[in-house]
Amino acid sequence: MGAAIAAAGLGLVYGGARVGLMGAVADAALAGGAEVIGVLPAVLTGREVEHTGLTKLELVPSMHVRKARQVELADAFLVLPGGYGTMDEMVEVVTWAQLGLHTKPCILFNTAGYWDGLLAFLDTAVEAGFVKAKNRGLVQVAASAKEAVRMVMGR
């Protein structure tokens, strides 16, 4: 994904760690010449090993400020497979879009069907009346890195 982002001439805004899936994405984006900005809460510098090779690393006071800053810096949100932190960020971004606080796309990279369960839940939430049908479209889906980058670019 990082190579595809760089090849498209895009930059990357992410959490700022050098470990895990996003650390690998950041490394690939950097290797391809992309600008990569990390936003890391200062309290996590002892837990998440900050990436020292980024174009820019911003230390912020809290997780809340981190998410707000990432929303401010990003033009779109591409959600890769992940756990609770990924879910937290994705749900907040979609909620803010639902409230009209931004109009930036949120795209799930559904590699190997990773997000199928979440997508089924969203459909159930619409059927049950907890999510408006028009808001279901706030979460877009890409099956490949190429498709995800095209969607980020609005194509």
Regions found by a protein language model. Give the residues of each.
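Glycine-rich beta-alpha loop segments
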Residues: 1-35
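Short glycine-rich anion-binding loops that position phosphate/pyrophosphate groups of nucleotides
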Residues: 18, 42-44, 82-86
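Glycine-rich, charge-decorated loop segments at or immediately adjacent to ligand/cofactor-binding or catalytic sites
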Residues: 20-27, 114-123
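Short, hinge-like loop/turn segments at secondary-structure boundaries
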Residues: 30-33, 53-57, 120-126
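Glycine-rich oxoanion-binding loops at beta->alpha junctions
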Residues: 39-77
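Short, acidic/small-residue loops that bind anionic groups at enzyme active sites
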Residues: 40, 80, 94-120, 133-135
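Active-site/ligand-binding-proximal alpha/beta "capping" segment
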Residues: 65-100, 107
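A charged, well-structured terminal subsegment
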Residues: 72-77, 127-155
